[in-house]
């Protein structure tokens, strides 16, 4: 009836509790409904005509008071004198005279039914209702509200993850760090023989969407071992102590399935630092302590590897990160340009692409995008192709998908007045022209005044020619000038300002503040850090590390940076007013201008800039080709190393098989020799027996001859 003995135990316990509650309820109910009175009180009530009816039932008399009695609404009972052998023939007469209804019942006929109705049926009902409730709670709470020690980990069999390193792109360094773990799980013997121990745990750290969970599954897929997957929040649910019990159960199962991988996603849910704060969570700390104990207790040579993922490594407890636990930290950061292109290739493997599609251009247009973003872009492009009735995805679909992710869908039904449209056009061209005429800015890719659903009335898209990991002070100032170029154009052309620059002002202010408070680009504060960035992988807000007075001075410095950048933008646009008007006219006519067309207009006035830009492009392309060649060389080296490891493993396996075969043959030969010797011994023994038997027969024959000759002699005499 019950597959889970623990569940049966809990239902029995709760049934006993329910029985006690039911017993108490029945006792209280009897106390409330029934009241015992003396027989003399009953007689007095009868004389006062305060009795409505009487029922003689076994050893007691049940009395129902009349409406005039003070005890109205209760059922009274008193002892029946007949039980003691005392008869009162006058009682029946008095009841008849008083007009009181009376009746005689046999209680034994109703005892069984009363017992069933009062006790058995309610208990059965409670039992089955409780069973159904616990069953539903089990299903809803992933293993059960009553399964205290059971973990909720999803167990993937050896080939069920379906993911290998081929499905992970743009994270070559992370994959390289994990190849060692895969090799260890493939063949733990060679590590044990040399005395090497693999790290017990590896912590995957990086922003959301970079592929930390995918990497963990790829490790399991490559190693072809069982894969336990569990979220940190799954350890703690509603009962104190459940988290620690689940940790114990998880590691117990892992040791039984070894070699295997245990993956804990979002481990910061249980691994937060125990800082002694008053608002500490005892249940979470118990779970963390149990996890630390288990990681100390198991032997990594058995082949159990713990992988965990988080995007908040700064909040993790130091004991969790010390050597012997999660002592290897693998950074899974945002992919670079080549990485983004490789990711796009992976996600577009099953998508029909046109021959003219350039994934490199899409990779260039998505700086800072993670794997999840790029997968979404490819899917959006495929959906757009289907929407337009095409059988394959073209470049336009991918370009539009990028813009949908960045700015939202086109909002063609939003009609702007001619004046507003003109303001938006000058605003966007102001951004683009300042970007084109400054030296430390990214090239303009597109200018549009088509409104978008995310609120933009138009936008200017800039795409970097190369990946930048360092930004100079001059570059940051020029970037701020570009941000303020739209407002500057409004001032130069219309001599007024609008609300359209709100987002530009916000971003410019944040960049200027970072220059002063974080990057040490202020002459007044030199290299003093006034703010610190928290949660770097989650785009956390800066935390101020200075006094109110210093913060006020820093605000003045920020204002000066913004003012200088603003003045630079205004100066550029005033000097190039004719170019500003010309490009704006083209934009108003076409609504969208691509970067090449825009730059051709600019090159018409500044031909020397064309040569400089082309030279810079060639240098960047050369560097990119070198980087790509190095990456391919590195990938080939890793591939060869893995193939060599597999070859050696195969050779070792064949040698082991050959050795086992030789040993088996030697054992068989030994057994054969033993059998031959045994057969020879048996044959020799048989020959000896035959010789003995022959000698015995010969002796018997001689005796017969002697007896015969003796008899002949006797007869002759």
Swiss-Prot record:
Keywords: ATP-binding, Cell membrane, Hydrolase, Membrane, Metal-binding, Metalloprotease, Nucleotide-binding, Protease, Transmembrane, Transmembrane helix, Zinc. Zn(2+) binds at residues 427, 431, 504. Residues 684-693, 701-717 have a biased composition (Basic and acidic residues). It is found in: Cell membrane. GO terms for biological process: protein catabolic process; proteolysis. InterPro entries: AAA+_ATPase, AAA_lid_3, ATPase_AAA_core, ATPase_AAA_CS, FtsH, P-loop_NTPase, Pept_M41_FtsH_extracell, Peptidase_M41. ATP binds at residues 206-213. CDD domains: RecA-like_FtsH (cd19501). The chain crosses the membrane at residues 8-28, 110-130. GO terms for molecular function: ATP binding; ATP hydrolysis activity; ATP-dependent peptidase activity; metalloendopeptidase activity; zinc ion binding. It is a multi-pass membrane protein. This is ATP-dependent zinc metalloprotease FtsH. It comes from Clostridium perfringens (strain ATCC 13124 / DSM 756 / JCM 1290 / NCIMB 6125 / NCTC 8237 / Type A).
């Amino acid at each position: 009836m019950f597959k889970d003995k623990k569940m049966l135990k809990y239902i029995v316990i709760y049934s006993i509790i329910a029985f006690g509650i039911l017993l108490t309820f029945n006792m209280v109910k009897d106390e409330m409904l029934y009241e015992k009175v003396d027989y003399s009180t009953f007689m007095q009530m009868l004389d006062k005509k305060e009795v409505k009816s009487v029922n003689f039932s076994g050893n007691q008399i049940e009395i129902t008071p009349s409406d005039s009695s003070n005890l109205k609404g209760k059922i009274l009972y008193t002892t029946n004198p007949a039980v003691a052998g005392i008869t009162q023939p006058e009682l029946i007469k008095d009841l008849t005279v008083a007009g009181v209804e009376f009746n005689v019942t046999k209680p034994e006929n109703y005892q069984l039914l009363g017992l069933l109705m009062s006790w058995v049926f309610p208990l059965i009902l409670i039992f089955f209702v409780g069973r159904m409730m616990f069953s539903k709670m089990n299903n809803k709470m992933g293993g059960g509200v009553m399964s205290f020690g059971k973990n909720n980990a999803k167990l993937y069999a050896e080939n069920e993850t379906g993911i290998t390193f081929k499905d992970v792109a743009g994270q070559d360094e992370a994959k390289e760090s994990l190849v060692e773990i895969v090799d260890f799980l493939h063949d733990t013997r060679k590590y044990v023989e040399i005395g090497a121990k693999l790290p017990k745990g590896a912590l995957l750290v990086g922003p959301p969407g970079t592929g930390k969970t995918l990497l963990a599954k790829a490790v399991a897929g490559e190693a072809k071992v069982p894969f336990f997957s569990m979220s940190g929040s799954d350890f703690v649910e509603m009962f104190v102590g459940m988290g620690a019990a689940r940790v114990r159960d998880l590691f117990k199962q892992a040791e039984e399935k070894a070699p295997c991988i245990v993956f804990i996603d979002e481990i910061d849910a249980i691994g937060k630092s125990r800082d002694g704060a008053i608002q500490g969570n005892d249940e979470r700390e118990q779970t963390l302590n149990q996890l630390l104990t288990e990681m100390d207790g198991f032997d990594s040579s058995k082949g159990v590897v713990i992988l965990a993922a988080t995007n908040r490594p700064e909040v993790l407890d130091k004991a969790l990160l010390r050597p012997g636990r999660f002592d290897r930290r693998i950074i899974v950061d945002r992919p670079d340009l080549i990485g983004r292109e490789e990711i796009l290739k992976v996600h577009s493997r099953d998508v029909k692409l046109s021959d003219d599609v350039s994934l490199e251009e899409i990779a260039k247009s998505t700086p800072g995008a993670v794997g999840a973003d790029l997968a979404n872009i490819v899917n959006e492009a495929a959906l757009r192709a289907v929407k337009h009735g095409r059988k394959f995805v073209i470049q336009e679909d991918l370009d539009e998908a990028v813009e949908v992710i960045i700015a939202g869908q086109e909002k063609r039904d939003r009609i702007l007045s001619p004046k507003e449209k003109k303001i938006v056009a000058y605003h966007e061209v102001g951004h683009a022209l300042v970007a084109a005429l400054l030296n430390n800015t990214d090239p303009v890719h597109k200018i549009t005044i088509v409104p978008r659903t995310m609120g933009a009335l138009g936008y200017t898209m800039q795409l970097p020619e190369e990946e930048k990991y360092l930004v100079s002070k001059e570059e940051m100032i020029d970037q701020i000038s570009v941000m303020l170029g739209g407002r500057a154009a409004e001032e130069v052309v219309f001599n007024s300002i609008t609300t359209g620059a709100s987002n530009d002002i916000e971003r410019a202010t944040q960049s200027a503040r970072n220059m002063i408070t974080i990057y040490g680009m202020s002459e007044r504060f030199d290299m003093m850090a006034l703010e610190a960035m928290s949660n770097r992988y989650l785009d956390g807000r800066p935390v101020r590390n200075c006094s109110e007075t210093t913060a006020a001075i820093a605000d003045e410095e920020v204002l000066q940076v913004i003012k200088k950048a603003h003045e630079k933008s205004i100066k550029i646009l005033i000097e190039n007013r004719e170019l500003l008007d010309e490009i704006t006219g083209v934009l108003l006519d076409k609504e969208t201008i691509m970067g090449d067309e825009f730059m051709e207009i600019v090159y018409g006035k500044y031909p020397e800039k064309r040569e400089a830009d082309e030279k810079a492009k060639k240098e960047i392309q050369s560097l990119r080709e070198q980087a790509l060649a190095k990456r391919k060389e590195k990938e080939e080296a890793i591939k060869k190393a893995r193939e060599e490891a597999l070859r050696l493993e195969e050779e070792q396996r064949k040698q082991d098989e050959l050795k086992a075969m030789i040993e088996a043959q030697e054992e068989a030969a030994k057994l054969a020799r033993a059998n031959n010797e045994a057969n020879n011994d048996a044959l020799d023994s048989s020959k000896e027996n035959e010789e003995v038997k022959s000698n015995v027969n010969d002796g018997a024959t001689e005796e017969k001859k002697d007896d015969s000759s003796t008899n002949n002699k006797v007869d002759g005499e």
